[in-house]
């Protein structure tokens, strides 16, 4: 049995300024996105499409806005709609927490669609480019969850079961944040990076991301404690699982569409 070390959520104290671990994890995710993005630009089939480091920087800016706005609205709509309907001003208090990946994902899709319009590129060409780097941010975020001792797992008697003091029940639980770090972070990054090293039909890389994330998240939710204000829903599945199922189905549809539309590897064309 292990005990969560209860890290100080503030990593650096600079007088009145407090820099939190979770903020540093966001920063680490952005740095990895830019670093691996620059490596991706050098791949011959990517360089042939004219991607530049300026595009990468601009995509990060658009993506951050999409994550924040979409993540917050997703949490409001998917998890606590009645509460925020009664307290609408609370929606603005993002510093108090409350973000949803699935909402952030939709926000990024909209942001990349807008970016594509500005650059005269199809939105799926944009998402195909960024998909292999997204797991870097997911991995960093899950480490942030673990450091904060939040989003712990269900009770377990496995040797690596961990007591999370913030749970308040002294029960060993799955360190589900680390499961998600390993699955939707490390493993998904490896799969996508290897898959995207070769030219693929437009939409294929994005589709594989949807399938991979949805599958890893769906599986990890069996070890993760459901949100106490929601519990388990129909078929004893969590909200995270129900939101992941459409991602898996959409990913399968995108991959099938991509290969039927462009057999073999094909380069996408800019939109007019």
From Swiss-Prot:
Enzyme nomenclature, EC number: 2.5.1.145
Record-annotated membrane-spanning stretches: 17-37, 59-79, 95-115, 129-149, 176-196, 202-222, 237-257
Subcellular location, principal: membrane
Chain segments annotated as coiled-coil in the UniProt record: none
Membrane topology, record value: Multi-pass membrane protein
Cellular location(s): Cell inner membrane
InterPro entries: Lgt
GO terms for cellular component: plasma membrane
Listed GO biological process terms: lipoprotein biosynthetic process
One Pfam family per UniProt: LGT
Pathway(s) per entry: Protein modification; lipoprotein biosynthesis (diacylglyceryl transfer)
Disulphide-bridged cysteine pairs: none
Keywords: Cell inner membrane, Cell membrane, Membrane, Transferase, Transmembrane, Transmembrane helix
Protein residues bound to a 1,2-diacyl-sn-glycero-3-phospho-(1'-sn-glycerol): 142
GO molecular-function terms, A-Z: phosphatidylglycerol-prolipoprotein diacylglyceryl transferase activity
Family statement drawn from the similarity comment of this UniProt entry: Belongs to the Lgt family.
Family matches, as HAMAP family: Lgt
Function per UniProt: Catalyzes the transfer of the diacylglyceryl group from phosphatidylglycerol to the sulfhydryl group of the N-terminal cysteine of a prolipoprotein, the first step in the formation of mature lipoproteins.
Descriptive protein name: Phosphatidylglycerol--prolipoprotein diacylglyceryl transferase
Origin species: Cupriavidus necator (strain ATCC 17699 / DSM 428 / KCTC 22496 / NCIMB 10442 / H16 / Stanier 337)
Gene: lgt
């Amino acid at each position: 049995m292990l005990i969560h070390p209860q890290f100080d959520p503030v990593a650096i104290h600079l007088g009145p300024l407090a820099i939190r671990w979770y903020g540093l994890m966001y920063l680490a995710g952005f740095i990895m996105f830019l670093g691996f993005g620059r490596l991706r630009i050098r791949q011959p089939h990517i360089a042939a499409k004219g991607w530049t480091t300026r595009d990468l920087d601009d995509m990060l800016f658009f993506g951050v806005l999409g994550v924040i706005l979409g993540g917050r609205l997703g949490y409001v709509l998917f998890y606590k709609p009645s509460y925020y309907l009664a307290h609408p001003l609370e929606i603005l208090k993002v510093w108090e927490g409350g973000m949803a990946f699935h909402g952030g994902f939709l926000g990024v899709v909209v942001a990349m669609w807008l970016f594509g319009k500005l650059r005269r590129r199809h939105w799926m060409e944009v998402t195909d480019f960024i998909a292999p780097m997204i797991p870097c941010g997911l991995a960093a975020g899950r480490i942030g969850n673990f450091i904060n001792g939040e989003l712990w797992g269900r009770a377990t008697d496995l040797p690596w079961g961990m007591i999370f003091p913030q749970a308040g029940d002294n029960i060993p639980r799955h360190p589900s944040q680390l499961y998600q770090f390993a699955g939707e972070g490390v493993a998904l990054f490896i799969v996508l990076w290897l898959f995207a090293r070769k030219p693929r039909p437009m939409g294929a890389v994005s589709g594989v991301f949807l399938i991979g994330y949805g599958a890893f998240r769906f599986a990890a939710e069996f070890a993760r404690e459901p949100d106490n204000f929601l519990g388990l829903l129909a078929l004893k599945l969590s909200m995270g699982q129900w939101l992941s199922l459409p991602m898996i189905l959409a990913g399968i549809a995108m991959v099938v569409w991509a290969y039927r539309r462009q057999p073999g590897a094909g380069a996408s064309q800019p939109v007019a």
